[in-house]
């Protein structure tokens, strides 16, 4: 299986599950490959044939983007190290949840939650602690007796009941056989990969500008200007846009560049993503712009930005330009 085949499979699964999808991100490097939304569920999906290809920098950006946009970041792949990903198993890479296409299908199409998570040392299952304790006490069985039957310590059984420790698959099967009840706790993928309340505030690690203030790049100066309008600005390194700008009432995918053919290409992609993320999309042009907008992405010249005094005025400017374009 190639990565291209994998991407098409993922898109097919999400579409079948009822998700609306953005255009594919065709830039390099990229922190995510496609954005998808179904009702209040927003996914930023990174596709990697080998999930170990995810690095810490990309994972960090995925988490911050998802947090700013009120969504969840996931990785979908086919293998890890020298073996294929197991179905119905979830993996973690730098606090980003990773899974196979089949697990994605089971969860979003069939509504079947996985039961097993991979961790150093093997595969583990979370136990329904209340059910275990109820089953044990109903049979008047002591912690010590159950521990001896399963081959673990009394403290371990206590931890299982408190849901403070996962168990191996063999232990869970043994416990279920003893009591005749299902004890494995299904994994909620959205919660596990950090499904957050919309517009929750993120706290990215902000890098200090290199050199003296006067040596800031033009793009950084423009982002500073947007920040002074009242926006919380999250710079990006691997997204189709330069930053996400956010205040209490709006979120803006923000591009910054001189006008060129690449800007038009990125503006198209930003427009598609903004429709899925339900945000505004703006490209600040450092110099003259030959266009006023590209689909839903509004192009604003730097000199026009300099005449705007606050975030509401910027939003009004964006809406006015959109209306003019649609007319």
UniProtKB/Swiss-Prot annotation:
An example of a Pfam family matching this protein is HTH_3
Q: What SUPFAM superfamilies does the entry give? A: lambda repressor-like DNA-binding domains
User: What NCBIfam families would the database entry show?
Assistant: PRK04140.1 (NF003162)
Asked whether the keyword Cell cycle is assigned, the reply is no
- Disulfide cross-links: none
Q: Which InterPro entries match?
A: Arc_TR_HTH (IPR020886), Cro/C1-type_HTH (IPR001387), Lambda_DNA-bd_dom_sf (IPR010982)
Q: Where is this region: Disordered?
A: 195-214
Instruction: Give start-end of the signal peptide.
Output: none
The organism's superkingdom is given as Archaea
- Per UniProt, residues of the HTH cro/C1-type domain are 132-190
Organism of provenance: Methanosarcina mazei (strain ATCC BAA-159 / DSM 3647 / Goe1 / Go1 / JCM 11833 / OCM 88) (Methanosarcina frisia)
Q: What's in the keyword line of the UniProt record? A: DNA-binding, Transcription, Transcription regulation
What is the protein name for this chain? Answer: Putative HTH-type transcriptional regulatory protein MM_0444
* Compositional bias per record (Basic and acidic residues), positions renumbered to this chain: 201-211
Gene Ontology molecular function: any one: DNA binding
HAMAP family on file: HTH_type_cro_C1
Q: Is the keyword Disulfide bond assigned to this protein? A: no
Q: Which residues bind DNA?
A: 143-162
């Amino acid at each position: 299986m190639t990565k291209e085949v994998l991407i098409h499979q993922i898109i097919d699964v999400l579409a079948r599950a009822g998700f609306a999808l953005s255009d594919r991100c065709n830039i390099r490097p990229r922190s995510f490959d496609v954005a998808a939304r179904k009702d209040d569920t927003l996914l930023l999906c990174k596709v990697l044939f080998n999930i170990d290809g995810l690095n810490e920098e990309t994972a960090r950006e995925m988490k911050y983007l998802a947090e700013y946009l009120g969504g969840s970041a996931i990785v979908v792949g086919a293998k890890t190290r020298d073996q294929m990903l197991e179905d119905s198993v979830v993996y973690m890479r730098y606090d980003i949840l990773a899974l196979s296409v089949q697990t994605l299908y089971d969860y979003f199409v069939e509504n079947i939650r996985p039961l097993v998570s991979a961790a150093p040392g093997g595969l583990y299952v979370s136990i329904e602690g209340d059910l275990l304790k109820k089953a044990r006490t109903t049979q008047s069985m002591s912690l010590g007796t159950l521990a001896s039957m399963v081959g673990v310590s009394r403290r371990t059984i206590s931890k299982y009941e408190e849901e403070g420790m996962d168990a191996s698959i063999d232990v869970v099967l043994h416990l279920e056989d003893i009591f005749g009840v299902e004890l494995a706790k299904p994994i909620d993928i959205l919660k596990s990969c950090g499904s957050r309340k919309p517009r929750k505030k993120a706290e990215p690690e902000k890098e200090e500008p290199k050199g003296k203030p006067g040596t800031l790049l033009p793009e950084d100066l423009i982002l500073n200007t947007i920040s002074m309008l009242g926006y919380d600005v999250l710079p990006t390194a691997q997204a189709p846009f330069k930053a996400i700008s956010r205040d209490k009432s709006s979120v803006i995918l923000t591009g910054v560049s001189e006008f060129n053919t690449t800007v038009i290409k990125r503006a198209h992609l930003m427009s598609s993503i903004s429709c899925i993320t339900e945000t505004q999309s703006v490209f600040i042009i450092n110099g003259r712009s030959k266009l006023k907008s590209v689909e839903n992405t509004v192009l604003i010249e730097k000199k026009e930005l300099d005449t705007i005094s606050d975030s509401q005025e910027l939003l009004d400017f964006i809406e006015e330009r959109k209306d003019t374009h649609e007319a």
